[in-house]
């Protein structure tokens, strides 16, 4: 938390957890929640941006003896992240899932905004205002999971831009992270969204390109992003490998930031 010379350092992670099931050649039959929790605890970030988090699922609770009694985000938070927020996006007969933010610091307020591009994909953005000791202004954190279609993503990025312009002061520190589903390398939509807001993608800063994060075993597609404002980037990493495939279809991304 405290860096060199008293600077404020923050560790963050973004992770699409695939509803708590691994990516396998066939249908996944065993949840990977225990392994996911161990993985996140080992990464030990201050803030975690999660996508495809199950808030409740009656069918899984009946079928799997080790299915947690609480929500997935509460189970993953355990004792490490005392503050958390959950945005319910997709609702079905058995339960619901969405995005979540886990935080070591107090979440002062939060809101989940429906940004679904059409009725076949339920998507949302989860916006939290967080009090981080040492920062002169509250941190704004936004977790997103965008559409599979380019047109849908473009509309959602515009909604995201509008929300940030309305609700986030221009001098406030800001992190936007999640699954942008932007698998086409020709796409300019994320860049066009970020530039007017003075947002910078952390892997583009450290490596020159967004991270390859999918599939987890041998990432090829650059689906996930971490955009920041008001921070310098100290370190970035993609946590991939065959063992990670047993946890989710995406690899987790982490970054170490220093407040400017």
Predicted features along the sequence, with ranges:
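Metal-dependent phosphoester-hydrolase catalytic domains
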Residues: 112, 129, 161-174, 182-260
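Active-site beta-strand/loop signature of hydrolases that rely on acidic residues for catalysis
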Residues: 12-17, 36-64, 102, 128, ...
């Amino acid at each position: 938390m405290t860096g060199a010379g008293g600077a404020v350092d923050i560790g963050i992670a973004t992770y699409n957890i695939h509803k708590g099931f691994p990516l396998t050649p066939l249908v996944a039959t065993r949840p990977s929640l225990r392994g996911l929790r161990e993985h996140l605890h080992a990464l030990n970030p201050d803030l975690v941006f999660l996508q495809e988090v199950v808030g409740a699922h009656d069918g899984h609770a009946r079928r799997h003896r080790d299915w947690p009694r609480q929500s997935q985000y509460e189970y993953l938070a355990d004792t490490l992240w005392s503050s958390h927020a959950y945005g319910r996006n997709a609702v079905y007969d058995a339960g619901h899932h969405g995005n979540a933010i886990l935080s070591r610091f107090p979440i002062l307020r939060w809101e989940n905004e429906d940004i679904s591009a059409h009725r076949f994909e339920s998507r949302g953005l989860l916006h939290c205002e967080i009090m981080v000791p040492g920062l002169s202004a509250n941190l704004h954190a936004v977790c997103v999971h965008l559409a599979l279609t380019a047109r849908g993503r473009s509309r959602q990025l515009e909604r995201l831009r509008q929300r940030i312009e309305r609700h986030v002061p221009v001098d406030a520190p800001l992190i936007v992270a999640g699954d942008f589903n932007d698998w086409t390398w020709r796409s300019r939509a994320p860049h066009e969204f970020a530039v007017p807001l003075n947002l910078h993608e952390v892997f583009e800063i450290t490596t020159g390109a967004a991270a390859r994060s999918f599939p987890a075993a041998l990432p090829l597609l650059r689906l996930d992003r971490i955009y920041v404002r008001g921070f310098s980037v100290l370190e970035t990493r993609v946590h991939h490998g065959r063992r990670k495939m047993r946890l989710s279809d995406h690899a987790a991304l982490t970054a170490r930031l220093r407040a400017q």
